[in-house]
Amino acid sequence: MDHVRNFYDTILRSSHPLLMAFHLAGKAAPLAFYIAGFLFPSFTALFITIVLLLAADFYFTKNISGRRLVQLRWWYDSSATSTETFTFESHKQYTAGPPINPIDSKLFWWSMYLTPAIWFVLGILAILRLKLITFILIAVATCMTGWNTYGFRCCDRWNPNNSQSTEPFFQLPSIPGLDNITRLARFQSFFQSAAN
């Protein structure tokens, strides 16, 4: 019982205790629903509930709690005109800003790194138990929490004064435009018409 009281006191020492509570609840809720999955009448209802909770946590962490607790914000730019895939906003850009509370930072980063690790362990257990449909749910959860963690990690290590530090170590491939596919189709139809 002392652990619960100490944890409660730690959250109260946060600069945003309500926001911190929602952040931690957003990480714990999908895990709790997964563990209590036997209470659901069907796996489909459980799957949809967990994916919706994960999506809400992804949005809340990325746009609200990350911005307020550690003063970081990131987004992925999928436009073909941009050479940089990630765009970052950080407290490092602004000289006179409020300091980051160490309790906020510690709880934020622990929850960000611990959540994908827990989902990964649950994924290994699902594979060992040969529950492949359950593994799909866990893979979605691991990808969503891991992608958010990766974005915040890159944002935290980003240096606004160094333009080369914006390149993440993992680059998603760019999808070519449809004009290349139409050129290929015209080229192929040229040879088909010549053969006839």
From Swiss-Prot:
The gene is TVP23. The keyword Cell cycle does not apply. The chain crosses the membrane at residues 18-36, 43-60, 107-127, 132-152. It comes from Candida glabrata (strain ATCC 2001 / BCRC 20586 / JCM 3761 / NBRC 0622 / NRRL Y-65 / CBS 138). Keywords: Glycoprotein, Golgi apparatus, Membrane, Transmembrane, Transmembrane helix. This is Golgi apparatus membrane protein TVP23. It is a multi-pass membrane protein. Golgi membrane protein involved in vesicular trafficking. Pfam families: DUF846. Its main location: Golgi. It is found in: Golgi apparatus membrane. Disulfide bonds: none annotated.
